[in-house]
Regions:
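Small cysteine-rich, disulfide-bonded extracellular modules of the LU/uPAR three-finger superfamily
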Residues: 1-91, 99-128
Length: 128
């Protein structure tokens, strides 16, 4: 992971419990959340923290469409923001969300403005 992304402490706690207690299986990734609070006033991505439990300014969540495995320790989640959603919004933060609604990884990036009539397809890699 780069400096603008983080695996949350919530995810690391859940991994620890799942590895040591069969009564606590790991919740699967079901959604990707998008937001507009991932940059500073100069437009540079800010570093997310492992203790974050929410995006700084969440705009929407979308269900994961597919998962691929580009290598044996990476799960790549694909999600599409539809043409009619988030028109005119600047997207600069994203998070993987598990089936319990917890943010498990956060990535901040440069702003991408969503145009009318255009769908955005995002890929988010979960690297182990």
């Amino acid at each position: 992971m780069n400096e603008n992304s983080v695996i949350t402490k919530t995810r690391r706690r859940k991994l620890c419990m799942a590895a040591s207690d069969p009564e606590k299986p790991l919740a699967v990734i079901t959604h990707v959340a998008f937001g507009s609070g991932g940059v500073n006033v100069s437009g540079e991505p800010i570093v997310p923290t492992e203790t974050q439990t929410a995006l700084n300014s969440e705009l929407a969540r979308y269900e994961v469409e597919s998962v691929t495995y580009p290598d044996e320790t990476t799960a790549r989640y694909t999600v599409t923001i539809p043409k009619d959603s988030l028109v005119g919004k600047e997207i600069n933060e994203a998070a993987l969300v598990d089936s319990e609604g917890d943010l498990v990884a956060i990535k901040n990036m440069y702003s991408k403005k969503k145009d009318e009539g255009v769908s955005f397809t995002f890929e988010f890699d979960d690297e182990f």
